[in-house]
Structure formats: structure tokens, C-alpha cells
Amino acid sequence: MTYLLLALAIVTEVTATLLLKASNGWEKWEYGSASIFFYSLSGIIFAAVLKNMGVGVAYAIWSGMGIALITAASVVFWKQTFDMYAIVGIMLIVSGTIIITSKSAVVFQ
């Protein structure tokens, strides 16, 4: 259940970030306002995750997966391109997240 809540926190945070980008610097205030809602929801869900998971590990997973998902979405929605350094860096972040979640004994401390 903790991983499901963490996934939901990640998805809501990614949604908030994408809405903030879509707001175009708050020119489209509806998107900006929606982003505040989703950031708040993400924080509430993440707080529930922290009841059962160590903050360092939970935050590493949350931020790592958020970076990967936002990067993918930016390619799809805004046709953003990345050089080799950015791609390798993102791969390292995702690799670290996978290692932490599969091998670390501190996940549920």
C-alpha cells in the first residue's frame, strides 16, 4: 500500500508540474490554480507515505521518478530535446531509484 500511495504522490506532483508549465507563467491562471491543488494533494499523500517509509528513501524515489516522468512528458507535449549528458544523467537517477527500491534495507525504517 505504501508504494501505491507513493506512486499516487508522484503522479499528482508530475501533474502539478505539467499544469504549471501549461499555465505559461500564470498567463493561463486556470492551469496555475489547478497546479496548486495537485501540489497540495501530492504533499498530503506524500505525508501518508512517510508514516511507513524513511524520508530519505521516499524522497529519492519521489524526486527520481518525478524527474523521469516529467522529462518524458516534456518530450511528448512540448517536443523538448535532450543531449547525451542529460539522457545519461536521467538514466543514472532512474538507476539509483531502482537500486534503492530493490536492494536497500532502509526503505521502511
Task: Tell me what each language-model feature is.
Residues 1-109:
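Polytopic alpha-helical membrane proteins, predominantly small-molecule transporters/carriers
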